[in-house]
């Protein structure tokens, strides 16, 4: 993220879910999922952010 968008940081908005905000089968309940966005919350970056996550084997 920092190499692609200088000054933009990765934001983790949720990892573990114990309040039931995700679907019943969500990996958040096992601590094996994470919701992420960028610090500028620019939705136009989300597709590339998803690609970067896949490339990083996340």
Swiss-Prot record:
Report the protein's function.
Intercellular signal essential for a variety of patterning events during development.
**Which UniProt key words apply to this protein?**
Autocatalytic cleavage, Calcium, Cell membrane, Developmental protein, Hydrolase, Lipoprotein, Membrane, Metal-binding, Palmitate, Protease, Secreted, Zinc
Q: Which annotated residues bind Ca(2+) 1?
A: 13-14
- UniProt GO molecular function: calcium ion binding; patched binding; peptidase activity
The compartments listed are: Cell membrane; Secreted, Extracellular space
Q: Which gene encodes it?
A: ihh
**What kind of modification does the protein receive after translation?**
The C-terminal domain displays an autoproteolysis activity and a cholesterol transferase activity. Both activities result in the cleavage of the full-length protein and covalent attachment of a cholesterol moiety to the C-terminal of the newly generated N-terminal fragment (N-product). The N-product is the active species in both local and long-range signaling, whereas the C-product has no signaling activity.
- From which organism does this entry originate? Devario pathirana (Barred danio)
InterPro entries hit by this protein: Hedgehog, Hedgehog_sig/DD-Pept_Zn-bd_sf, Hedgehog_Signaling, Hedgehog_signalling_dom
User: Any coiled-coil ranges, and where?
Assistant: none
Q: What is this protein called?
A: Indian hedgehog protein
- Give a Gene Ontology cellular component term annotated to this protein: extracellular space
Concerning PANTHER family, the annotation shows:
HEDGEHOG, INDIAN HEDGEHOG PROTEIN
Q: What the record says about its domains?
A: The indian hedgehog protein N-product binds calcium and zinc ions; this stabilizes the protein fold and is essential for protein-protein interactions mediated by this domain.
Biological process annotations from GO? cell fate specification; cell-cell signaling; proteolysis; regulation of gene expression; smoothened signaling pathway
> Where does the chain bind Zn(2+)?
28, 35
Positions that bind Ca(2+) 2: 14, 17, 19
UniProt-listed Pfam families: HH_signal (PF01085)
- State the taxonomy lineage: Eukaryota, Metazoa, Chordata, Craniata, Vertebrata
Family to which the UniProt record says this protein belongs: Belongs to the hedgehog family.
UniProt keyword annotation of Cell membrane present? yes
Q: What is its main location?
A: membrane
């Amino acid at each position: 993220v920092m190499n692609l968008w200088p000054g933009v940081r990765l934001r983790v908005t949720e990892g573990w879910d114990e309040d039931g905000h995700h679907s019943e089968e969500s990996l958040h309940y096992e601590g094996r999922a994470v919701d992420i966005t960028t610090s500028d919350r620019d939705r136009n970056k989300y597709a590339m952010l998803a690609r970067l996550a896949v490339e990083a084997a996340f």
